């Protein structure tokens, strides 16, 4: 229970992101005024591997990839120092850059949509002020991010002619509003035996206060207030992102877990709370992304494989030994080794994830090998007439060196896997160490528990006495083994008499295997049918949000009508880029539908092909690691200073 459950091990990616918002700026302005100064500043940081950026309307994203040898804390601090120096070059009106370490554990473990017939602004405030704090109180929840809906804001529309008459500029008014909208510390003063802190409250509390703010002095010496030179009104913020669930506009909430928290436990706790929140605040929630379902399904399948593999291993031992007591003694090595390995995993801070469970499942056959070899050696001495205690002692001592050599050979194979360099090494560290620890524990058990039980439970035999099992089934099994022995002896005799031919055949098989290996594809992590698809749409530059929303909505409707589609969750204008749309298509469980996810990809592509305005579209599996995004298998970057030339070259490459 104390071992965390997750999809993959916790890994640290050496990435730092610098995001800067520049309201109202075009991508070209963002590139020139924000992105380049930041890129120039951070490129000189020691340990930087490469820097790449993304400049969009209103926002600049600079990604800094460090070498794995650089401590991530030091990398973040160095980036913060350099960006702080470059901040003086950024234009007036741009917001302060936000520097953040990329953390894969900070990705949502649960995403759900919330819909209501209430006022959009009031509903978002309800979710932000009432629902989010309740969810964040759950143990293991780090934060809840809200996307979509309408946010309140105060709009100030300046009258240019009045500003001109007073000699004011929009920039001066903007700075005046910033200067007035502040809470400042005012020091402290003694009050008897106490000391009272003083704070000057200057933040606006209402729209009327904003209207009444002085901005200048008139020709007659009277105060000119903001309401005299501008229309000041409260209203919803301009919508740049639309969230829809099955065609209905909604708000999405993304639940992010704390580092090291149990993903499945956190997600299930949130799902348990949702019905109460729905009833209390009168909204409808729908689960869109649930990491717990994937984790629990994968863990269940692996545990089934582990138990089935263990049962088959014990059955095979029984068939070969034909000795109930011997099988019982040897089979005890399996659960004791697994339990010991779980304790070791807990001590090393590992979680139960696909890599550690894969290591355990692969080790099942290895865990019992040492005990079987020791038990077989003891059995031979028992059949020679030795008493159980002597047979256990001398039988174990006889094969100790061989068993140790076999075990340490396995350790020598898997320990280097745990210490591979790069991100791959971080992923497979827990895998390699889990297998290595498991076989070492099995060696310890084979040299301690197995001989002890053999000395106490094994039955002494007279020389030449038969096995315990002596029925007709045991007789047939022994006859089968005897026949195999004769076949093996004849085969071995032939091989020894035709050494050249045998060596040539082995060489041919080796060379052929190299050819087959080269023809096989390779992946960092395998794709699987997870009952979800990701759809990305891109419309031409200049496409408005209403146009993108309407066209995406028509396509969403066509996809929802496909049999086997459970839900379509769409975000139009992700990161406020209104010409983009991103969907999550939830399919019914793969065991309940006749077609694979690949068939649905083709159907969705056929639907998307009907929209002639689409610039590009892509249908793919969800990212294996949610935090890494859905990067394509091949990514080409066209670099240059002239955007028109870049667009032409990119279009030419797409045609090729």
Report residues per predicted region.
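Membrane-proximal extracytoplasmic
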Residues: 1-311, 320, 329, 352, ...
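Transmembrane helices with small-residue packing motifs
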Residues: 1-26, 84-94, 350, 418-427, ...
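Helix-loop junctions and hydrophobic alpha-helical segments within the transmembrane domains
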Residues: 288, 295, 299, 375, ...
């Amino acid at each position: 229970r104390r071992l965390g459950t997750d999809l993959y091990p916790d890994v640290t990616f050496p990435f730092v992101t610098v995001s800067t918002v520049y309201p109202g700026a075009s991508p070209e302005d963002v590139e020139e005024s924000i992105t380049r100064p930041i890129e120039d500043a951070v490129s000189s940081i020691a340990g930087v591997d490469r820097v790449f950026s993304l400049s969009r309307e209103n926002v600049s994203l600079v990604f800094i990839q460090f070498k794995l040898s650089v401590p991530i804390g030091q990398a973040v601090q160095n980036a913060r120092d350099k960006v702080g120096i470059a901040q003086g070059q950024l234009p007036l009106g741009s917001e302060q850059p936000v520097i953040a370490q990329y953390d894969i554990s900070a990705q949502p473990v649960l995403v759900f949509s919330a819909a209501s017939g209430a006022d959009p602004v009031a509903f978002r405030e309800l979710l932000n002020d009432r629902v989010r704090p309740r969810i964040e109180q759950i143990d293991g929840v780090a934060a809840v991010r809200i996307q979509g809906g309408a946010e309140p804001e105060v709009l100030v529309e300046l009258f240019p002619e009045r500003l001109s008459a007073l000699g004011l500029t929009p920039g001066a008014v903007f700075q005046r509003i910033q200067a007035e909208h502040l809470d400042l510390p005012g020091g402290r003063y003694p009050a008897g035996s106490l000391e009272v802190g003083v704070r000057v409250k200057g933040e606006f509390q209402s729209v009327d206060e904003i209207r009444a703010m002085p901005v200048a002095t008139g020709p007659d010496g009277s105060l000119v207030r903001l309401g005299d030179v501008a229309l000041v009104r409260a209203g919803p913020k301009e919508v740049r992102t639309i969230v829809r669930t099955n065609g209905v506009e909604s708000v999405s909430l993304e639940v992010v877990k704390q580092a090291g928290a149990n993903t499945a436990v956190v997600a299930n706790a949130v799902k348990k709370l949702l019905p109460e929140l729905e009833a209390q605040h009168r909204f409808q929630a729908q689960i869109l992304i649930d990491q717990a379902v994937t984790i629990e399904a994968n863990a269940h399948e692996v545990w089934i494989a582990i138990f089935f593999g263990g049962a088959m291993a014990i059955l095979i031992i029984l068939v070969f030994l034909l000795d109930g007591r011997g099988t019982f003694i040897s089979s005890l090595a399996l659960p004791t080794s697994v339990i010991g390995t779980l304790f070791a995993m807990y001590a090393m801070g590992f979680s139960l994830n696909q890599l550690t469970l894969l290591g355990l499942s692969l080790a099942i056959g290895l865990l019992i090998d040492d005990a079987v070899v020791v038990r077989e050696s003891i059995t031979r001495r028992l059949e020679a007439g030795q008493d159980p205690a002597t047979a256990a002692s001398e039988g174990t001592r006889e094969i100790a060196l061989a068993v140790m050599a076999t075990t340490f050979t396995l350790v020598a194979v898997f320990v280097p896997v745990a210490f591979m360099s790069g991100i791959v090494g971080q992923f497979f560290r827990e895998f390699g160490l889990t297998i290595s620890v498991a076989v070492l524990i099995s060696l310890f058990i084979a040299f301690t528990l197995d001989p002890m039980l053999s000395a106490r439970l094994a039955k002494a035999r007279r020389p030449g006495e038969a096995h315990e099992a002596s029925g007709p089934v045991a007789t047939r099994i022994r006859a089968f083994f005897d026949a195999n022995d004769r076949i093996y002896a004849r085969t071995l005799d032939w091989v020894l008499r035709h050494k050249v031919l045998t060596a040539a055949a082995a060489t041919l098989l080796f060379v052929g295997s190299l050819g087959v290996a080269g023809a096989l594809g390779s992946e960092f992590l395998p794709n699987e049918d997870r009952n979800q698809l990701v759809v990305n749409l891109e419309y031409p530059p200049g496409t408005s949000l209403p146009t993108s929303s309407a066209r995406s909505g028509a396509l969403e409707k066509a996809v929802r009508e496909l049999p086997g589609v459970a839900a379509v969750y769409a975000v139009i204008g992700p990161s406020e880029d209104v010409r983009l749309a991103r969907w999550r298509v939830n399919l019914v469980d793969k065991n309940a539908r006749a077609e694979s996810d690949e068939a649905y990809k083709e159907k969705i592509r056929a639907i998307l092909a009907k929209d002639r305005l689409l610039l590009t579209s892509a249908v793919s599996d969800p990212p294996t690691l949610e935090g890494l995004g859905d990067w394509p298998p091949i990514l080409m970057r066209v670099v240059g200073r002239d955007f028109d030339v870049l667009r032409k070259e990119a279009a030419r490459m797409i045609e090729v």
